[in-house]
Design a protein with these regions (language model features):
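N- or domain-start disorder-to-order transition segments that initiate the globular core
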Residues: 1-22
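Single conserved hydrophobic/aromatic residue that forms the stacking wall/gate
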Residues: 275, 280-283
Length: 283
């Protein structure tokens, strides 16, 4: 696979790979911001923005409708490190994708109505995932055991429901202009599109988006764990459950993938070592 690269004057990095076997083009834009960049008393903002980014921009009040009319689809996800948005569109309508992504990078439609709508969606998601089902709050219990100083200690959805509930429009604007910048993003384009056309469309639609002052990340260092940490919680749940976590190498470490595979071998699915060796009522 041939990978092509181009950097715009405003700092946006373009990564491209051509695939002529398909009639589709995919655009993936990754912003270098996640839950680790949040203030400890204002968590859940990165995930809230994943939702706000679909609430319309200054020139495009409805993000989904133009994409659907062009035969495209989209989605997004957030974790502690990054926020990722992607769309696919037929090759003949590829410029629609560039138009949509560049306009919401330039400026969202910061309205109180949009904030209230998306705030409600995120709060309902928090309740359904973390409060209204057995074991839903395990991330809120396990993470502070594993990380006592580093901001990995709270899940992406937020440390406390009140943080999103009390978020103001000014705080939301400040978060956007702090992190949603071309010089803090990577645009990946793949599918039935040449490198020359990808560069041309990227320059056309993203070239005028101004570079912004992105803060230097200065995260607290997590001290080495020297002893076991354990928490026992009694809850009215169907079955007892055991959750164990181990520190492992970072993504950029050469041993990361070895540990990732090891975790699957040990505990992922019905053929994992843990599943096959633990006694069950059927044996």
């Amino acid at each position: 696979m041939k990978i092509n690269r181009h950097i715009l004057d405003n700092g946006l990095r373009l990564v491209h790979s051509q695939d002529e076997s398909t009639q589709m083009v995919a655009l993936n834009i990754l912003y270098n911001v996640g839950a680790r960049d949040e203030h400890p008393e204002h968590t859940g903002f990165a995930h809230l923005f994943e939702h706000l980014m679909f609430g319309g921009s200054v020139n495009i009040p409805d993000y989904d409708m133009p994409l659907q009319l062009a035969g495209g689809e989209n989605n997004a996800w957030t974790n502690n490190d990054i926020t990722n948005y992607y769309l696919t569109v037929p090759r003949q309508n590829v410029e629609t994708g560039f138009w949509l992504e560049s306009d919401r990078m330039l400026s969202l439609d910061f309205s109180g109505r949009s904030l209230e709508v998306q705030r409600g969606v995120v709060m309902e998601e928090f309740k359904q995932r973390c409060l209204n089902q057995p074991y839903g709050d395990v991330g809120h219990l396990l993470r502070p055991l594993a990380y006592q100083k580093h901001p990995y200690q709270w899940p992406t959805i937020g440390k406390d429901l009140s943080h999103v509930a009390n978020a103001t429009l000014e705080e939301v604007k400040a978060f956007f202009f702090r992190f949603y910048a071309p010089n803090n993003a990577i645009l990946a384009v793949t599918g039935n599109i040449s490198f020359e056309e990808a560069v041309e469309l990227t320059e056309k639609w993203f070239g005028s988006v101004p570079r912004r002052e992105v803060p230097v990340r200065n995260l607290p260092q997590e001290p080495e764990q020297t002893e076991e940490r354990r928490l026992t919680v009694e809850r009215n749940v169907p079955l007892d459950s055991l959750f164990m976590a181990y520190h492992m190498p970072a993504h950029c470490h050469p041993d990361y993938y070895t540990f990732d595979i090891l975790s699957d071998v040990l505990s992922n699915g019905p053929v994992s070592y843990t599943h096959l060796t633990l006694p069950t009522t059927s044996r």
